[in-house]
């Protein structure tokens, strides 16, 4: 976590390279695969922009165009090298695994439950819901998708088994300045 001074992510961001745990290396490799498949639409090097806009510190602000252009110089998943447990970043780059960490965590929780002999479960990590098996009565799990325009309503319900349902929206992490809403989903 970028908010934890002792985390692998913080150490890599501070030093530009180093050895990480097997688990962090696994998550980073998975993130790199997703980045490649999405042609960079998902990119763990987004951290400089998240920090610039204040989403990492809650000191929100609209940065100048020149600041954004400067931060963008370090944003590209191709600036990350993962070789075993060794990670290196190109100068000016820094990472944030927040976009993949909850999904990984819910998968690990499900695996631990399976290893303990549990046959039916739903794990809800707020925006990340993962289910395995069916409900105990044999029916599918039902997962509601929140309506971003109305906190107490939903857009629809998915019936599913053995799947993850992951959502993210600008209605949870955002700030307003001069009548304009700015959210944490950055393109």
Q: Locations of the language-model features?
A:
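Mature catalytic core of soluble alpha/beta enzymes
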Residues: 1-187
